[in-house]
Regions:
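Buried hydrophobic residues that stabilize the cores of well-folded domains
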Residues: 1-201
Length: 201
């Protein structure tokens, strides 16, 4: 899928473990916009802990745009406490993005759901294939509880003016069977609600 007609995403070379969770795939992105052409190849590998929860994501990127060729790599690490997700930290070059979760009440994740707020922010916003894998259960077991707050901290060692910290309160609307119908982020005078319509996948 793409936001512009000039963009294309093609995923390939999928690998899975014995639990059915994805352990690797490749993603090719192309943008044929005449004002800024780009081609990018991303290779992902995924590691899980003994509880079947995502532990580490490794990425290698090779690309080419109007400014020339480039290569970079990065990794995303997950931290849990008693099967409850505490932190996701993504590192690439001199940039670190951490997502820290708070749990002020025990809201059980009854159906092992993985809404986008439990994914690394960069991948959730840029990689539609990753999102589909998460929503359909191919990225391992989710946290045992649903968080009630989230803090996103971006640190740029080369340009500290880009550093930022944002904190959001989280709430959920559950169906009669305790499945997530929607979730809401609130903070800084804004409230954003996102539906969880699993039938679209």
């Amino acid at each position: 899928s793409s936001e512009r007609e000039s963009e294309r995403w093609i995923a390939s070379d999928f690998a899975f473990n014995t639990s059915g969770f994805v352990t690797a795939y490749k993603l090719k992105y192309t943008d044929t916009d005449p004002d800024f052409r780009e081609e990018m190849n991303i290779a992902y590998t995924f590691n899980y802990n003994a509880d079947g929860q995502m532990q580490k994501i490794s990425m290698k990127v090779d690309g080419k745009d109007d400014e020339g060729s480039y290569s970079e790599s990065g990794e995303i690490n997950y931290t849990y406490n008693n099967k409850v997700l505490e932190k996701i930290e993504a590192k690439s070059k001199n940039i670190t993005c951490s997502q820290t979760y708070e749990y002020t009440q025990a809201i059980k994740n009854t159906y092992n759901a993985m809404p986008l707020l439990l994914l690394p922010e960069a991948l959730a916003s840029d990689d539609c294939v990753f999102n589909v894998f998460a929503i359909t259960g191919y990225l391992g077991n989710a946290g045992a509880n649903l968080p009630t707050a989230m803090t996103i901290k971006n640190t740029d060692l080369e340009d500290p003016s880009e550093n930022s910290t944002e904190r959001y309160n989280l709430s959920y609307t559950l169906n009669e069977n305790k499945a997530i119908s929607s979730y809401t982020l609130s903070g800084y005078g804004e409230t954003m609600t996102f539906p969880c319509d699993w039938t679209n996948f």
